[in-house]
Amino acid sequence: MKRILAVLMSTAMVLSLAACSQETAKTPEEIYDEALVKSMSLDALDGDMEIAMDMDMGGMTLGMKMSADMQIKKISDTESEMAMVMNTSILGQEVVIEEYFKDGYLYMNDGAGTKVKAPFEYSEIAGQATMNTATSRDFMDKLEMTEDENGNYVFNYTIAQDKMNEYLSDALEGMDELVGDTGSYTIGEMTGTCVIDKDYNVLSDKVHMVMNMTAEGQEVAMSVDVSIVYNAVGDAVTVSFPDDLDSYTEV
């Protein structure tokens, strides 16, 4: 069970991070691509993410919810700051985990009284840390645009199953210990809604996914809903840290 939950959480985080990239003469594709390019140049973002999972394991159902408040800011080419507070609710229990990245250290508070820190080189993840708030159109096989009552662009899209399955396989490469040698995972359906304002800022992204997975000989059918709302980007972002980081135990 622990292995199944671990891979489910890893998969959801990978997919949620992948899913979330005026003039009337412009096509919907051109408007979306312009917002995507702008999002890729961001050096800071503040967002709230919610993930809801419903799983069916051989007739046994299990629901899990997770929320995350995150602030990420690039200080320089070699330094970044991050604050993320995650709240997970499963089987009637809530677990709150805090993670921070500052001054070359990764800090973690497991919510049970353990507070640790460890040296961490930003350069190790710099190539993977591009802040992108919109889903790449390379994954899509359908994209439709309307406008809401505030004049924002609302994009409804469908993700191509083969492309996303290939992306998921690559993203989770090296995590065989989670699903085991005989484990597998396949996305059966994935759709989303992305809201972009007139200045090409991504305001929110919602994704619905249906997935089947096998781990530890157990077949799991899963429905996942991910919602991300961006509160601020760029200079408007301030990364907030707790006052007691100096008291964390180095490991």
Where are these regions (language model features)?
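Positively charged n-region of N-terminal signal peptides that target proteins for export
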Residues: 1-4, 8-9
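Subset-of-secretome marker
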Residues: 21-251
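C-terminal motif of bacterial Sec signal peptides marking the signal peptidase cleavage site
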Residues: 16-19
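Enrichment for repetitive, rod-forming helical segments
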Residues: 9-10, 105
